[in-house]
UniProtKB/Swiss-Prot annotation:
Glycans are attached at residue 41. Belongs to the PMP-22/EMP/MP20 family. Induction: Strongly down-regulated in the initial phase after sciatic nerve injury. Its main location: membrane. GO terms for molecular function: cytoskeletal motor activity; protein serine/threonine kinase inhibitor activity. The gene is Pmp22. The chain crosses the membrane at residues 2-31, 65-91, 96-119, 134-156. It comes from Rattus norvegicus. This is Peripheral myelin protein 22.
Amino acid sequence: MLLLLLGILFLHIAVLVLLFVSTIVSQWLVGNGHRTDLWQNCTTSALGAVQHCYSSSVSEWLQSVQATMILSVIFSVLSLFLFFCQLFTLTKGGRFYITGVFQILAGLCVMSAAAIYTVRHSEWHVNNDYSYGFAYILAWVAFPLALLSGIIYVILRKRE
């Protein structure tokens, strides 16, 4: 049981790190001399030094992506806190339903954010000289891992 708890805890912390990095890092779209994330657009010199950064667009779809990414981080942190609370207060044989629900909500939020960004980013960047950055990919990787850990929490029973 201890190994199972350590495994699910490791998976949860990995999801949390993926969510934090994908929300914060400026690598959602990368192209010729520019990087874009949820918060700002940056142009870079040929040597890779940042020359100019300006705030991202105020379009509604981007604000919804920002909000759902923040919600996913909040739900995942709350889920981790609830897991520790339930670990010490739950009766023997009880399930971690609340923890699992919040982790599944975190997964659904990050999936919604990445899907909206995938569909709508072409309105923001009209040229096609870009590719998806590693933060965008980390967001998509966090989605199934968060769902998996949420499902494991729902199935998991507490033992002594």
